[in-house]
A protein has these predicted regions:
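Conserved donor NDP-sugar-binding/catalytic core segment of glycosyltransferases
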Residues: 89-120
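The conserved acidic donor/metal-binding loop of glycosyltransferases
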Residues: 81-86
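Glycine-rich, basic loop-to-helix element that forms the pyrophosphate-binding segment
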Residues: 55-72
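Short, acidic, metal-binding catalytic loop of nucleotide-sugar glycosyltransferases
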Residues: 19-28
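Acidic donor-binding loop at a coil-to-helix junction in glycosyltransferase catalytic cores
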Residues: 162-168
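Short aromatic/hydrophobic "clamp" motif used to bind/position activated sugar donors
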Residues: 77
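A recurrent flexible, glycine/aromatic-enriched loop bordering the glycosyltransferase active site
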Residues: 62, 112-113, 126-147
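Active-site donor/metal-binding and catalytic loop motifs
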Residues: 113, 183-219
């Protein structure tokens, strides 16, 4: 029914990748992991519905995502980031929105953000949900992209290491493909301490000023599930 594709250069995040995938309530699913660093080890990751590939670290993130998506057994692709949180019903709800709205790409323009060092849960652009993207002023969060495999035949990810998700959406709009932002719930972008290599390189203090503060908590799951009633 759906293929999750994750490309990573962080061996310490592999366990989180498996946890996010295994947590999903949807039964008919598979996970494709692309190891994009030459010294990363496969370990014991292989399972019937998990496949692992290793691409040379000279390959860009965009190229890795294209390769992984082309290995998919299912016709719908979900791009998972290796360091974020996806609730048990994330895939189920994304598929429902994709079908109900009849669009090519779904995701979330408004998202929860958890600052791990401060144990602070916030909402970034909380009002940016349930709308069609019509211009290039607002984009879906890269870790929330879910799309039909056939989209990549028209619009593959470009060979970029940063901004490949934004460029993908721009290219989709140029090709008159439809993009839709779903609800805020079921996904959390996690901000780790400074030593973590974030693709979005902005100081936590600056980022927090752009967010609505929700709670200081060790466990954010109850706040972010669909119907959690936090906003």
């Amino acid at each position: 029914m759906i293929t999750v594709v994750t490309s990573t250069i962080r061996e310490n995040m592999l366990e989180r990748v498996i946890e996010n995938f295994s947590r999903q309530s949807l039964e008919e699913k598979e996970l494709i992991i692309i190891l994009n660093k030459n010294d990363m080890k496969l370990g014991n990751l292989v399972a019937p519905n998990i496949r692992v590939f290793q691409l040379d670290e000279k390959k860009t993130l965009g190229e890795c995502l294209n390769f992984g998506s082309m290995q998919a057994r299912y016709e719908t692709i979900a791009k998972f980031d290796d360091d974020d949180y996806y609730s048990p019903v994330y895939l189920e709800n994304a598929l429902r929105v994709l079908k109900d709205k009849g669009v090519d790409v779904v995701g979330k323009a408004g998202i929860f953000v958890y600052f791990k060092k401060d144990k602070l849960l916030t909402a970034f652009r909380p009002g940016m949900n349930s709308f069609f993207l019509k211009n290039k002023r607002v984009f879906l969060a890269g870790g929330t992209l879910v799309f039909k495999k056939e989209v990549l035949e028209k619009v593959p990810f470009q060979a970029l290491n940063n901004g490949e998700d934004i460029q993908f959406q721009k290219d989709c709009l140029d090709q008159k493909l439809s993009l839709y932002s779903g609800s805020l719930h079921d996904y959390v972008l996690i901000r780790y301490p400074e030593s973590h290599q974030h693709s979005w390189r902005v100081l936590d203090e600056t980022f927090q000023k752009q967010c609505r503060w929700i709670a200081v908590t060790d466990t954010f799951e109850e706040y972010v599930r669909d119907g959690g009633g936090t906003l």
